[in-house]
Amino acid sequence: MENNSQNVLKKIEDLKKEVRMLKEENSKTKRNLMWKIRKLEKDKLLIENERTRLDREVKSLRGEIERFRTPPLVIATVTEVLDDHRVAVKSTTGPHFVINYSRFIDRKQLEPGARVALNQQTFSIVDVLPSEKDPVVTGMEVEEKPDVSYEQIGGLEEQVREVKETVELPLKKPELFEKIGIEPPKGVLLYGPPGTGKTLLAKAVAHETNATFIKIVASEFVRKYIGEGARLVRGVFELAKEKSPSIIFIDEIDAVAAKRLKSSTSGDREVQRTLMQLLAELDGFESRGNVGIVAATNRPDILDPALLRPGRFDRFIEVPLPNEDGRREILKIHTSGMALAEEVDIELLARITDGASGADLKAICTEAGMFAIRDERDEVTMADFMDAVDKIMGVEKEEEYKQETGVMFG
């Protein structure tokens, strides 16, 4: 009897162990199944997201195919606006039409001269197009600002101040002029010998202001066929008004603004037509708006008097050859990044380079560096600068230096 009880107890213990093992195995199996379920749910979510993305892409591609199947539109120009949602247009193919336009199109946009797109079958207006722009004109806009600041211009403190007052101040603080009750100046003419920093001043203006900067060399206005130059001038000012506040910089303006003479060739007459268009844009019937003008020339003596009257150019800023103090500042700017020997005397270089322009001084610094590179040296010596002065400005400057110091350079 006792043995039977022990056997029963043993079987019960065995069954308990088996139950525990089954529970553990069941728990482990459950965990595995839950992990697989979560993984499948995650995979399902990824597949659904991919399907959604592919559906959007298919929809986009179908829309692209539909756009390709759409027939091209006809470009026309509005000639007259009539009543009852009708306008008269002239198509690019030649004929004139009286057509309808949708009520969804803004009536104010349909002015004579506006460009519109017409349906090929019904010739109804389906869209109003932006005004046509000459690619030559749009290419004149400076997209990236020059890296020239006013601090990099030496010896022209007075000129910088006047340029700031004339060009920058009306754009940045127009309320000052309203408070005083005067119209801000909108035109400045920079004149002086070549290489004195006129274009550099214009670059600094472009760098310092947030206005649209349009740069053009005046010779680009000179065109082969009659009326092309005037059209280009008109396009430049239209672009400037559209993107105002803006600044137009006309370099070498004497190319189109020379004095008009009685006797002239057909080419001269076309240049004069271009000049008259420029005069009209500078101070014509329509206001220039928030558009500033900066022009530069080496020959102010040959400019047409009509260009020089107030209202077209309000300020005339002379950019002369730098004096000794100016040359010293310019040399300091150009040598600031150079490896100079201790013997280099900037004061002396400023004294012996009388008559040098800012461009000459920059060339002297560059040449001195080239002499050091040629001799495989790590620094620029005074002898290199003297050789550079000799090369850029002539032997007389080196002789002047020898007389001052009694030093000979081989």
Swiss-Prot record:
Q: Name one GO biological process term.
A: proteasomal protein catabolic process
- Quick check: keyword ATP-binding in the entry? yes
One term of GO molecular function: ATP hydrolysis activity
- Subunit annotation: Homohexamer. The hexameric complex has a two-ring architecture resembling a top hat that caps the 20S proteasome core at one or both ends. Upon ATP-binding, the C-terminus of PAN interacts with the alpha-rings of the proteasome core by binding to the intersubunit pockets.
- Tell me its family: Belongs to the AAA ATPase family.
Q: What is its main location?
A: cytoplasm
What organism does the UniProt record list as the source?
Methanothermobacter thermautotrophicus (strain ATCC 29096 / DSM 1053 / JCM 10044 / NBRC 100330 / Delta H)
Comment block on domains: Consists of three main regions, an N-terminal coiled-coil domain that may assist in substrate recognition, an interdomain involved in PAN hexamerization, and a C-terminal ATPase domain of the AAA type.
Taxonomic path: Archaea, Methanobacteriati, Methanobacteriota, Methanomada group, Methanobacteria
Looking at the record's lineage, which domain of life comes first?
A: Archaea
Please state what the protein is called: Proteasome-activating nucleotidase
